Amino acid sequence: MGFTRRRQAHEALIHRVDAELTAGVPVGSLDPELAADGIDEVLSVMWAELPAWASFSPTEGVIRIEATDTGNAWTIQLGQMSGTSTNTGKTYDEPSVRLCEPGSHEPDAQVRGSASDLDQWLWNRGNQRIERSGSRAALDGLAALIAAGVQ
């Protein structure tokens, strides 16, 4: 039940952002704690949670993502998810991430911003005021993952 409520809360939040963008009005502020949880859901559930039949291969680099207003931070390893679905037989080979344990990897790049800006950015709802530094290849890999969209 908790997973469903969490998912619905973030879906409703992004639908609100979409409605404001469509109406051409400024996007209202997002609750920082809800936005930070939204970041966590994208990174840990939507991108990093792999099916049992899939494997992960590291690629472009390690990125630290920091919400400057809440103090939350995540370190991710970019990579490829590959495998064949045991349900459909479809073969996958697509960008993915793996969450790193805090302090386990030195980041190649950093991304910083408010939780609200980062959450919207990960959902491909604009650049907001995101600070990026470090490896261009790692940042480009993350940008490609964001451009592919959250599913």
Stretch-by-stretch model annotation:
Residues 1-7, 14, 20-151:
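Structured surface interface patches that mediate subunit assembly and partner/cofactor docking
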